[in-house]
């Protein structure tokens, strides 16, 4: 196992700093940052970047990611699902009619 430390999200794109009303920090240590993430219906989160993450989805919903190159991807969140999310910069919009609520575990090591 490679324990090389990765840099956390660049400060300028760190969702915890940019979006404190959406990303509540629950835990941080040398290995991970754990967030309670909430996005209201129709809400658009500005460009931000997460490290590689595991997401535990707490309720159903639909969201759209818009990437720096302009491409978009609509994703369906299913309550109880556990999802791997690669490190990348994106905007997120809740395109559904329910709150998006998840726990995001952002890895600091590989």
Describe every region a protein language model picked out.
Residues 42-45, 81-93:
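Histidine-centered metal-chelating micro-motifs
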Residues 41, 59, 78-79:
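Short, flexible surface segments
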Residues 16-46, 51-55, 104-105:
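A short glycine-rich, His/Asp/Glu-containing loop-to-beta-strand
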Residues 50-69:
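Glycine- and acidic-residue-biased ligand/ion/polar-headgroup-sensing regions
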Residues 69-87:
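Short acidic-glycine-tyrosine-enriched beta hairpin
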Residues 2-24:
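Extreme N-terminal tail/first-helix region
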Residues 87-108:
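Ligand-binding loop in jelly-roll beta-barrel domains
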Residues 49, 75-76, 95-97:
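Extracellular/periplasmic catalytic domains that process cell-envelope and extracellular macromolecules
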